Amino acid sequence: MNEFQRGGNKHRSWQQCFLYPLFFQEDLYAIAHDYHLDRSSSSEPAENCISNAFSFLTVKRSISRIRQQNESIVLFWNCDRNQWIDRNRSSSSELILEGLVVVLEISFSMRLKHSLEVMNGWKSFRSTHCLFPLMEEKFPHSNYILDIRVPYSIHPEILVRAFRRWIRDAPSLHLLRRILYECQNSSNAENLQKAILVVLRENTKFYLFLWNSYVYECESILVPLLKRSSHSRXXXXXXXXXXXXXXXXXXXXXXXXXXXXXKKIWLLKDPFIPYVRYGERSLIAXKGTHLQVKKCRYHLLNFWQCYFHLWFQPYRVCILELSKNCSSFLGFFLSVKMKSLMVRTKMVDDLLITYIITNEFDAIAPIRSIIGLLAKERFCDISGRPISKLAWTSLSDDDILDRFDRIWRNLFHYYSGSINQDGLYCIKYILLLSCAKTLACKHKTTIRVVREELGSKLFTKSFSKEREFISSFFSKTRSQRERIWHLDILRIIPLANSWQKIQNKKK
């Protein structure tokens, strides 16, 4: 990758984003083949056997055939006809498609690096770990939240229009258009005949690239808009102060000056706008009246529709009042609590007492929903009564203990900062008894016998006492109200992810 980028910096066509000659480089398809082997080695053996059918001789013949035919635009189309994006497509077409994505990713990464250098004034943290400090964030200037869900069914021409901004050669655009229309024809969605689901198959590299480039286009217009609005509000505040001073001189002239100054002020009055995104969900915290937030939502929808030339459904942008509504995000219920801080100001003759009111997030773990998902996985019934995991009775005792320990460790680490810790211990009790019942069912004995035979091994190896250790360590220096987040989480856990999908379907 680095060699291609260093070589591309010297080449003029690469600087102008002429990508079509790079599609004929055999080394790129070798990179895609190695990536596919690394990915399939950690998955099912069947995928590894299918990848052995890939032949570089087919790629070389296709390259030479297309070089001889100047009128040909579709690359490698004769390798596997009508099997580009099919569910039963061969490994050759899949790997060739991933080779095309390698070329696009190199150019996209260079464009992303350039855009980050331009937007260096915007303080952005592109990591999963920055999402958890959001739960501890205070919003003294915000009273509403815009809950935005990015649409994932779009027309292929919209993606081509987005690619046209950074790909300048017509053959590459025609090739991408042909592939995208094949994706559209292969989708079986009846109500989306003219759209393409960019997250239809998240496990393929091509759809991941489509989703990342599409989200980048969405944020490339949203983030500068928020940044520009914050600067414009700072300048407009001085104009509003000048209009207020003119109000003492002439009331009629002040009304006209205030109306002119109000046009410069943005709809929302918040000088600091928190923005966070994970997947298709985005949250924007803002300050203002309900009418101002509705106008902001209206203009945001119109701006998005004019930019992408697509119908942005209004229900995808919800307005939530922080003091009344709870929002589900990242597998948590987010409720806002108003906290007042008393400030005493001592003067010469008097003592002034004022109260500063701030809004704080309270992250609540959805205990009932987690119990329902555990019941779906056969760890308990719908009422929360633990049952044995019959599918694991053929495993060894250490494997059973390790699996239950891994489930509890992931749940505990992910929801360690939630305020309802008692509910987590209910989940621990369910998993602990389910583990004991699974071992008892395997050895055809009772739970009491299992606890007597394993003894402390059941409770130390599985479900370790790390919470008590951490709490005792921090209690010496911090208050008990402080919450502890474990930042060894690289992604949202599957239980929280599945629960979040259920919540999205309800909206």
UniProtKB/Swiss-Prot annotation:
Known role: Usually encoded in the trnK tRNA gene intron. Probably assists in splicing its own and other chloroplast group II introns.
Could you confirm whether the keyword Hydrolase appears in this record? no
- Tell me the organism: Araucaria heterophylla
Q: Under which name does UniProt file this protein?
A: Maturase K
Compartments (UniProt record): Plastid, Chloroplast
Say which family it is in.
Belongs to the intron maturase 2 family. MatK subfamily.
The protein's UniProt keywords, in alphabetical order, are: Chloroplast, mRNA processing, Plastid, RNA-binding, tRNA processing
GO MF term (any one): RNA binding
**Recorded GO CC terms:** chloroplast
**Which HAMAP family does the entry mention?**
MatK
Name a single GO biological process: RNA splicing
